[in-house]
Amino acid sequence: MANTREHRYTVSLTWNGNLGTGTSGYRDYSRNYEIVSNGKPAIQGSADPACRGDRSRWNPEELLVASLSACHKLWYLHLAAEAGIIVTAYTDRAEGARDCPGLY
């Protein structure tokens, strides 16, 4: 793969969960954050609700599963095009799981 070029991806994540006392205690701060990159719409994030996060925001686990799903879809479409297979629609329902021993 001598013709491979390195691609770099940069995002900025800002924690905006200081409720006035910073991280003075486990229950004293919000897990909310914002992700931005190159003028794209911001992603409002938080922790998983089980970890005191805001369920209306994307959590890192959901973003990881979405990222893997998107990569799989893009590769699938590439392989289909290369093989002369015409794809006219695509839907994926990806799922992830994790164990959280001792987190609470």
Which functions belong to the PLM regions below?
Residues 1-66, 74-104:
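Extended beta-strand/beta-hairpin segments
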